[in-house]
A protein has these predicted regions:
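Alpha-helical transmembrane segments and their membrane-interface boundaries
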Residues: 1-197
């Protein structure tokens, strides 16, 4: 993400395309496990919180430490298991002719384009554009346009409801609005309700 942000948006698009493509193809070959959302939200978090100089070095060291810890845990728990596929086999099996390959391509291209549009429009927090794209695109086996309409409806309804509730609430209660909406968000299963409650955060 730090490289993509330091260059022209058009070049950044290709940097993001390659980076996101590597993540999705190498680590998201079981979409029902939800790993795409996890890894790509982490990518967008890094994109939305850029650092330079000493802080960038510290971030790299933190990530290396996290990698070593996770690698050690993974090794201890899985060292006796036999895996049918190696890393390069997974990468070689990527194909646009399979449902998995089409879904992976949809996520890679959609997220990269979302970031590019956010950069070209000079959105303050491009991270949120990417996160919105992710919630629409990463659901395996579901048409993205259905979730896009649910998101649009949830945002419109949530924004209107937030405006009304914020005007009615006493000043002392307004600071707790995000906390309570977050708690309610955890109880929601339907995507449109989650989108609506996100407007309160």
């Amino acid at each position: 993400p730090c490289i993509a942000q330091s260059v022209d948006p058009a070049i950044g698009f290709f940097v993001n395309l390659l980076s996101i493509g590597f993540i999705v193809i190498s680590a998201c070959h079981e979409p029902l496990y939800g790993s795409a959302g996890l890894y790509l939200f982490a990518y967008m978090f890094l994109y939305g919180n850029p650092v330079e100089g000493r802080l960038l070095v510290l971030r790299a060291l933190e990530m290396l430490l996290g990698l070593l810890i996770c690698g050690a845990v993974f090794y201890v728990n899985h060292r006796k298991k036999q895996y049918e596929k190696r890393f390069f086999q997974i990468v070689k099996e990527f194909s646009l002719s399979t449902p998995l390959g089409k879904w992976q391509f949809q996520v890679i291209l959609g997220l990269s384009l979302g970031i590019l549009v956010g950069e070209l429009l000079q959105v303050d927090r491009v991270m949120w554009v990417g996160c919105a794209c992710l919630t629409v695109l990463t659901q395996y086996g579901e048409r993205p346009n259905k979730r896009a309409f649910q998101r649009l409806g949830g945002v419109v309804a949530g924004s209107l409801l937030f405006g009304i509730v914020y005007q009615v609430l006493p000043p002392a209660a307004k600071s707790s609005l995000g906390i309570y909406s977050g708690l309610l968000l955890g109880l929601c299963a339907a995507y449109h309700w989650k989108t609506l409650l996100n407007c309160f955060g």
